[in-house]
Amino acid sequence: MTTVLLVDDEKLVLRSLEKTLLRAGYDVITAHDCPSGRDTFAQNAAKIEIAVLDLNMPSFDGMPKTGAGLDLLAELKKQKADLPVVILTAYDEVNKAKDAVAGGASAFFVKGREQGLVELIQKILKG
């Protein structure tokens, strides 16, 4: 079974996405900010096959930061360079999408259509 690391600071969004991914047959490990995402990944790196990270959440200093997900992306890629990563955002920001992909993300996904996220993950994992 595929294991997904899901990191989002909004509890309701985290729960909704987690339920969607569980129903789709994935194992899901959750975290709520950059430090917990990094630590959770470090403890489970061998089994995590893809990460889904919120773009805007508390950064490593605990303060909310626009683009903090890109910082976490960089940290995860240091630990596992070939890790596929999807960056989530509530905002359809083309420039941030380009930043995410340039920073090593596999894709960028605008929150709100959970089933679309499942389809995107399936597509990425199939290569």
Model-derived segments and spans:
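Conserved phosphotransfer cores of two-component systems
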Residues: A42-A46, E75-L83, G103
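Two-component/phosphorelay signaling modules centered on CheY-like receiver
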Residues: K11-T30
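Two-component signal transduction core modules
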Residues: A51, V85, F108-F109
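Acidic, metal-coordinating helix/loop segments flanking the phosphotransfer/catalytic sites
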Residues: T30-D54, F60
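Alpha4 helix (beta4-alpha4-beta5 surface) of REC/receiver domains from two-component response regulators
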Residues: M63-G67, D71, K78, Y91-F108
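C-terminal output helix
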Residues: N95, G112-K123
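Acidic di-acidic motifs
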Residues: D8-D9, D54
